[in-house]
């Protein structure tokens, strides 16, 4: 280990210990050893399995980001326990999804009648149950699992980018870009499944691109595809349809590739139908909806200006009207959560504020647009297909949700960030890229100011 890495490791260790001392509430007998083990898994994976694109900078990125997430987890556990009157086994979770997933899983683990109403059954509770059955009933257990998944996601995105570009620097840039996506970073510190889902998406893409580029069937990409499909099945079942479109988009002229991807597509459909048929919601003793029963949530409801502008509830709109609103929905999906609302969601956990500072998210979007208009033609076919798949999924998500749930786009980052990293590392395009970023910054400022006025002073636009 060189001197720079030694400094990084020692600084990160001190930061984690300091947070643990200043913010009591976590079960340190689990959390600190778990941090060491998970950190060791990440560094070992990067050093041993990624030798072709390993770099000291990449390892430093992984260690720093993982340590930052662990500190965020300690902060949130303090908030869920000491600050709110809960405990690590019985935390106070104001986020309805987190509350339902945790307490439903705990009731299932204890074999008790369910007092938590789950509107849409999800297999994710079995992941929470399994982790807590092995490591103890502790909110820190699934959160540390999230931290591990975030680190593995960084490595997977780096591997995808290296597979597409064969350039170590571009791979490190992609890893850095993944690590500064503040929304995804925040998701790793709360009990939500978007980070593991992003990892599953990245693993699936890794297998998909390897088959497309190598044009032959081998053991490693098949394992990646199967792991991705299995993970998505447990985390967000409907997203299997997105994986299905990916298998179709990557079909080409090669018969071996087409046969393999057709088989993968068929497997996805079979798994989707089978998983849907097994879904059920057990009878509950008392239905409890967080949105109705939690007074804190009731007090923090806010008017949605976007819904007001739409006029008609989005789910009642015709397909034609949804298509008319689609460009605006995509823009809203890209812009939210707005920076000035950073205190709005801190009731769910102090780290929620981080999600609102998505300036690197905006930067990545600007660079990706530049890639579409200037560098798409000089990129290889695999990168082009991957990027267009990401665009299709982003637009489809906006169409389904009217752009109101931007976190649904987080698992799509592995489809877009390789093109972003490729653009940043292309020296011949630096000057036009900087000019475009300047123009984009002006347009972004004007748009955000307009959105601020619409949200804060809606009566002015009636």
Name each region found by the language model:
Residues 78-102, 113-127, 136-137, 338, ...:
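Extracytoplasmic catalytic/substrate-binding loops of multi-pass membrane glycan-assembly enzymes
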Residues 40-47, 144-164, 367-371:
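Transmembrane-helix motifs of polytopic, lipid-linked glycan transferases
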Residues 6-16, 65, 224-225, 378-398:
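Transmembrane alpha-helix segments characteristic
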Residues 157-180:
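Transmembrane-helix signature of polytopic, membrane-embedded enzymes
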Residues 163, 169, 214-221, 345-351, ...:
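Membrane-interface helix-loop-helix junctions at transmembrane boundaries of multi-pass membrane enzymes
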Residues 185-186, 220-239, 243-251:
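Membrane-interface alpha helices of multi-pass inner-membrane proteins
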Residues 43-44, 158, 329, 333-380:
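Hydrophobic, aromatic-rich transmembrane alpha-helices
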Residues 189-197:
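Short acidic/glycine- and proline-prone juxtamembrane loop motifs at membrane-interface regions
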């Amino acid at each position: 280990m060189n001197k720079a890495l030694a400094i990084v490791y020692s600084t990160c260790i001190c930061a984690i210990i300091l947070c643990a001392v200043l913010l009591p509430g976590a079960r340190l007998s689990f959390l600190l050893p778990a941090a060491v083990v998970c950190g060791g898994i990440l560094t070992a994976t990067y050093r041993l399995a990624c030798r072709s694109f390993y770099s000291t900078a990449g390892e430093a990125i992984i260690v720093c980001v993982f340590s930052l997430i662990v500190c965020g987890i300690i902060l949130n556990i303090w908030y869920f326990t000491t600050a709110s009157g809960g405990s690590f086994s019985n935390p106070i979770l104001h986020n309805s999804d987190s509350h339902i997933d945790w307490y439903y899983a705990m009731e299932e683990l204890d074999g008790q009648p369910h007092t938590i109403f789950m509107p849409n059954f999800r297999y994710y509770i079995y992941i929470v149950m399994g982790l807590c059955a092995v490591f103890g009933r502790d909110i820190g257990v699934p959160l540390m699992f999230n931290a591990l998944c975030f680190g593995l996601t960084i490595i997977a995105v780096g591997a995808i980018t290296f597979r597409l570009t064969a350039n170590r620097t571009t791979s490190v840039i992609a890893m850095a870009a993944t690590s500064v996506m503040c929304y995804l970073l925040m998701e790793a510190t709360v009990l939500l499944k978007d980070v593991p889902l992003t990892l599953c998406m990245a693993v699936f893409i890794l297998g998909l691109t390897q088959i497309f580029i190598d044009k032959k069937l081998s053991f490693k990409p098949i394992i990646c595809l199967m792991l991705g499909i299995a993970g998505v099945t447990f985390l967000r079942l409907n997203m299997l349809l997105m994986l299905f479109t990916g298998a179709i988009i990557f079909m080409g002229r090669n018969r071996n590739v087409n046969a393999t991807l057709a088989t993968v597509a068929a497997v996805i459909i079979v798994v989707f139908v089978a998983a849907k048929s097994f879904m059920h919601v057990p009878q509950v003793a008392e239905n409890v909806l967080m949105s109705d029963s939690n007074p804190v949530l009731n007090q923090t409801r806010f008017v949605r200006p976007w819904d007001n502008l739409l006029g008609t509830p989005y789910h009642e709109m015709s397909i034609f009207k949804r298509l008319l609103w689609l460009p605006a929905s995509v823009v809203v999906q890209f812009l939210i959560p707005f920076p000035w609302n950073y205190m709005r969601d801190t009731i769910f956990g102090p780290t929620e504020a981080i999600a609102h500072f998505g300036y690197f998210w905006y930067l990545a979007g600007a660079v990706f647009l530049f890639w579409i208009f200037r560098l798409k033609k000089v990129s290889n076919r695999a990168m082009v297909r991957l990027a267009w798949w990401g665009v299709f999924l982003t637009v489809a998500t906006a169409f389904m949700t009217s752009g109101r749930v931007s976190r649904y786009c987080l698992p799509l980052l592995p489809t877009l960030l390789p093109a972003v990293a490729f653009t940043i590392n292309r020296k011949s395009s630096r000057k036009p890229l900087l000019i475009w970023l300047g123009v984009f910054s002006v347009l972004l400022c004007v748009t955000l100011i307009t959105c601020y006025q619409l949200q804060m002073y809606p009566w002015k636009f009636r």
